């Protein structure tokens, strides 16, 4: 793979301002283009407008599931075009999926795209399969946000965005500080009905009983943030989901090498598939094999969606990591469970479990 995209010093995009235009891209699933998502478009655009932001749907973003599944090149083109367009200040992923790795050859062999990322860094946010896009940008030296996306957050079908997630999104807008992440006082079950008829219904919510939990290790630690969705990281390293995914990701050096993991804080969270404990154990074990737990300064683990396998996951983490000195903080509000905060790749996080806060800053 070419050295052109060897990691530079991190570049940080400017925050969004009133009047800015944001692009919506479908880099994974094409569901935003399906009729059953039309109400989401309406809700999301309205909420962005309330922030004084103009929405631009990239030309291929609404072409639907089948078309985008068959045309990774079209998905990649949207991302490139968004970077080439000076009128676009930020890029919001529509939603995750499971095959955005197919975009890598079209982007990481395109000098124009790489150049545009270096010369005009833009705010980029999303989670889940978007982990792959984040790691690509990390490799290119652009700091991005593991946080809200269009369908799940801006287009949340409750009357309002979920307050904790809303605050995370607002941190992308100039003038809003987002220095401290604390545990959300409530958590929400995943919806079973996302259709138009359910618009205006509230999610089932629960009082948070656990807060951030220190499973082991010292109470205070720090490091730059690096990580993503655990299943995405596992898929990069195996042929389990797609036969060619491991080879494609290896070709472009997508999974950070061991030097890169040194003194980082690894953040990981499980997806909506709610992996059974045996699968979770495999996913943690592969990171252990890679040596990640030997060199990072600590680990943040997201709350499992619907608190699935809550205690089993905790026990597996401690057992497989097998290093009692490594700090592991569990049940942090990021990723697939709602509500969600935002974590910035490459930002310095200072975790203080005496006060149960995570402070993040760019430096």
Model-based region annotation:
Residues 9-88:
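ATP/NTP phosphate-donor binding region
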Residues 38-41, 72-76, 108-110, 280-286, ...:
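Charged helix-capping and loop-helix junction motifs
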Residues 279, 285-288, 294, 298-363:
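ATP/nucleoside-binding phosphotransfer catalytic cores, i.e., glycine-rich phosphate-binding loops
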Residues 145-231:
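Conserved anion/nucleotide-ligand pocket segment
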Residues 225-277:
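Oxyanion-binding "anion nests"
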Residues 1-5:
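Short, small-residue-biased leader/transition segments that mark boundaries at the very start
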Residues 107-137, 143-151, 327:
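Short, acidic/small-residue loops that bind anionic groups at enzyme active sites
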Residues 83-108:
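Long, hydrophobic/aromatic-enriched structural stretches that serve as scaffold segments
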């Amino acid at each position: 793979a070419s050295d052109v995209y060897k990691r530079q010093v991190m570049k940080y995009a400017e925050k969004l301002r009133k009047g800015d235009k944001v692009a919506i891209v479908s880099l994974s699933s094409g569901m935003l283009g399906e009729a059953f998502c039309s109400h989401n478009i309406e809700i999301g655009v309205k909420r962005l407008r309330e922030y004084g932001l103009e929405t631009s749907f990239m030309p291929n973003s609404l072409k639907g599931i089948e078309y985008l599944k068959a045309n990774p090149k079209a998905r990649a083109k949207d991302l490139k075009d968004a970077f080439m367009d000076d009128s676009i200040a930020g890029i919001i992923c529509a939603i995750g999926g499971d095959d955005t790795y197919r975009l890598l050859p079209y982007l990481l062999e395109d000098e124009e795209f790489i150049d545009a990322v270096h010369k005009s860094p833009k705010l980029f946010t999303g989670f889940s399969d978007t982990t792959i896009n984040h790691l690509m940008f990390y490799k290119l030296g652009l700091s991005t946000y593991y946080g809200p996306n269009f369908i799940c957050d801006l287009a949340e079908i409750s009357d309002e965005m979920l307050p904790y997630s809303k605050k995370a999104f607002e941190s992308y807008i100039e003038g809003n500080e987002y220095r401290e992440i604390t545990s959300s006082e409530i958590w929400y079950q995943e919806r079973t009905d996302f259709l138009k008829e359910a618009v205006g219904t509230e999610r089932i919510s629960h009082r948070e009983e656990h807060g951030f939990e220190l499973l082991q290790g010292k109470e205070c630690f720090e490091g730059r943030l690096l990580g993503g969705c655990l299943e995405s990281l596992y898929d990069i390293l195996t042929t389990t989901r797609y036969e060619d995914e491991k080879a494609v990701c290896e070709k472009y050096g997508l999974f950070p090498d061991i030097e890169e993991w040194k003194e980082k804080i690894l953040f990981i969270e499980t997806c909506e598939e709610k992996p059974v404990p045996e699968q979770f154990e495999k996913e943690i074990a592969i990171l252990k094999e890679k040596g990640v737990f030997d060199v990072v300064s600590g680990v943040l683990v997201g709350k499992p969606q619907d608190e699935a396998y809550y205690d089993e996951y905790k026990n597996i983490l401690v057992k497989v990591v097998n290093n009692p000195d490594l700090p592991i903080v569990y049940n942090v509000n990021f990723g697939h469970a709602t509500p969600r905060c935002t974590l910035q790749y490459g930002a310095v996080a200072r975790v203080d479990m005496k006060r149960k806060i995570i402070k993040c800053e760019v430096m």
